[in-house]
């Protein structure tokens, strides 16, 4: 049993040594670390999603904002003069949807 364990350890050591030697022989041009931190625009756009402009709110969403804003008299007054979106944004922050 000890002989089997010794042979397994020796074979693992041999595999590790040969795999380290094969990875060290790559040319410098294939190393991604040498490319730097800048990438082309088309490659970067595949990784980072662009923010989209907010779409049009539906009547149900606007009614929901109106119901929240009606509970505050100042918000309700601003809603009548400036509009529901401006009033909600001023008193409650960005629209959640």
Swiss-Prot record:
Annotated Ca(2+) 2 binding sites: 67, 70
Propeptide: 19-52
Main subcellular location of this protein, as a coarse class: secreted
Disulfide pairings: 69-75
Xref: SUPFAM superfamilies: GLA-domain
Residues bearing the modification 4-carboxyglutamate: 63, 67, 70
Domain Gla: 53-93
Signal peptide positions (record): 1-18
Superkingdom of the source species: Eukaryota
Alphabetical GO biological process terms: biomineral tissue development; bone development; cellular response to insulin stimulus; glucose homeostasis; negative regulation of bone development; osteoblast differentiation; regulation of cellular response to insulin stimulus; response to vitamin K
Coiled-coil annotated spans: none
Keyword Transcription regulation annotated: no
Molecular functions (GO terms): calcium ion binding; hormone activity; hydroxyapatite binding; structural constituent of bone
Residues that bind Ca(2+) 3: 70, 76
Gene Ontology CC: extracellular region
Family in the record: Belongs to the osteocalcin/matrix Gla protein family.
The name this protein goes by in its record: Osteocalcin
Gene: bglap
């Amino acid at each position: 049993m000890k002989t089997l364990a010794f042979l397994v350890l020796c074979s693992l050591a041999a595999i590790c040594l040969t795999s380290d030697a094969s990875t060290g022989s790559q040319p410098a041009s294939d190393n991604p670390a040498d490319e730097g931190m800048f990438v082309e625009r088309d490659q970067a756009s595949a990784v980072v999603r662009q923010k989209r402009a907010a779409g049009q709110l539906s009547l149900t969403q606007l009614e929901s904002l109106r119901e929240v804003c009606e509970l505050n008299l100042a918000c309700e007054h601003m809603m009548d003069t400036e509009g529901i979106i401006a009033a909600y944004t001023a008193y409650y922050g960005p629209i959640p949807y």
